[in-house]
């Protein structure tokens, strides 16, 4: 009986470590911010192009027409969709998949190097 409890505790500790690693890996995902508004056919097209990459970043959409986003509206009102990766400008108008791939790979390598 004691052996079983010890194994259960060991399994629980292993599971906790796995969950901690999973949550750490989620934190390591870069944030791709999409500055958008409705309607925006180019934004819809961009989201389709991004589908194959969806497990490699967290997509955050910012509606530039909302009052709290007026700064972004003034900056990007004629240029949406605009993309930032981890807060840095990446591209606008259309998804450049080679640029996106290059930047994602670079960030993924940085994460691997720190682990």
Curated annotation (Swiss-Prot):
Q: Which residues form the signal peptide?
A: none
What keywords appear on the UniProt entry? Disulfide bond, Electron transport, Transport
- Give a yes or no for keyword Ion transport in this entry: no
GO annotations of cellular component type: mitochondrion
SUPFAM superfamilies xrefs:
Thioredoxin-like (SSF52833)
Disulfide bond residue pairs: 40-43
Q: Which Gene3D superfamilies match?
A: Glutaredoxin (3.40.30.10)
Per the record, the domain of life is: Eukaryota
Q: What is stated as this protein's family in its record?
A: Belongs to the glutaredoxin family. YDR286C subfamily.
Q: What is this protein called?
A: Glutaredoxin-like protein C5orf63 homolog
